[in-house]
């Protein structure tokens, strides 16, 4: 595990927080306290530090925060546990009103999240189970996403196919999605030949190297389940380099404009994915923590429903971007999760 020296960390945090604009001084008309007066501060702390999904998530966070007139801070731990804890502590020290924790490891975050609660700060978590009744969990039904895409894999390839999965244990969404893969393996007689994966700053490149070795050693693999978009990118890169796109197919989770472009390339191996709109997830996270700040607890679980998107769907509908997808698939436009009459829509 890498460690960040205090001077470098301080500089990084200062730069991150300097990006934030002023909160809306006049407040929101008709909103409950403290939003009626303005000056509300929210911090969104992400475990990841790169990728199309994170970019879209943060865009959604910013869009909804702007609509609420919130002073927002965005920070990324770049896959480092210590840095994520430090960023949350920094948010506590700044006396923000709410913290959004985006991904991470539960065993690393439970105590620091409780520390925020003890300081009177509202906390919501996305894709990391902090097992705390006071912390709403923003969830995109990981099990449903995995089931949707694996049902498509069985439909396309039939029962009993030989496959592999890219998976790293200890991340709640990956754990839940991989559990469904194991469920399907038992139910449909799927043969799991290999499991591989890594979470670092260069996921696609690292996974590509691993995948090439796996596919060379296991030429009978016909399907690769990728429970994260960055994994899928790496697997596709490996398949393309090995020239086996007609033989090995990818069934994944998550979607972005870059993913759509990869799925619609000629002879692409990426056949289907199941996802929610990352930008909508970001909007919901801000609404959920805002409700908590206003004393309107959004519930222990705030659920977003996923949608299956196949390569055929994209090609037939001439979909090239997330914006195109939103026009064709209404589920990608918005969510009614964690809403209230006083919360304006993000623009």
Question: Which residues does each PLM region occupy?
Answer:
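A residue-level marker of the well-folded mature domains of exported/periplasmic proteins
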Residues: 3, 25-347
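Bacterial N-terminal signal peptides
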Residues: 10-20
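Bacterial N-terminal signal peptides that target proteins for export
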Residues: 1-11
């Amino acid at each position: 595990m890498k460690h960040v020296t205090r001077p470098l960390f301080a500089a990084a945090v200062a730069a991150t927080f300097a990006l934030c604009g002023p909160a809306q001084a006049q407040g929101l008309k008709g909103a409950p306290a403290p939003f009626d007066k303005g000056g509300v501060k929210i911090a969104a702390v992400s475990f990841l530090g790169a990728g199309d999904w994170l970019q879209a998530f943060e865009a959604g966070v910013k869009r909804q925060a702007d609509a609420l007139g919130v002073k927002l801070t965005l920070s990324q731990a770049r896959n480092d546990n210590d840095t994520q804890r430090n960023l949350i502590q920094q948010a506590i020290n700044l006396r923000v009103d709410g913290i959004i924790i985006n991904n991470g490891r539960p065993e690393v975050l439970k105590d620091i999240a409780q520390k925020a609660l003890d300081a009177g700060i509202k906390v919501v978590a996305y894709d990391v189970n902090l097992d705390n009744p006071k912390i709403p969990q923003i969830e995109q039904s990981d099990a449903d996403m995995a089931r949707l895409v694996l049902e498509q894999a069985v439909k396309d390839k039939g029962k009993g196919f030989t496959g592999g999965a890219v998976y790293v244990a200890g991340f709640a969404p990956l754990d839940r999605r991989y559990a469904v893969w194991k469920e399907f393996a038992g139910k449909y007689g799927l043969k799991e030949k290999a499991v591989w994966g890594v979470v670092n700053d260069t996921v696609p490149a690292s996974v590509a190297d691993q995948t090439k070795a796996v596919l060379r050693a296991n030429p009978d693999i016909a399907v690769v389940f990728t429970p994260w978009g960055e994994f899928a990118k790496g697997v596709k890169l490996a398949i393309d380099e090995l020239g086996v796109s007609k033989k090995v197919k990818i069934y994944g989770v998550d979607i972005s404009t870059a993913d759509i472009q990869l799925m619609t390339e000629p002879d692409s191996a990426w056949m289907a994915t199941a996802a929610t709109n990352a930008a909508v997830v970001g909007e919901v996270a801000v609404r959920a923590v805002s409700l908590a700040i206003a004393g309107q607890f959004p519930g222990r679980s705030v659920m977003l429903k996923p949608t299956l998107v196949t390569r055929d769907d994209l090609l037939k509908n001439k979909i090239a971007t997330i914006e195109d997808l939103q026009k064709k698939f209404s589920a990608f436009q918005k969510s009614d999760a964690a809403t209230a009459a006083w919360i304006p829509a993000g623009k």
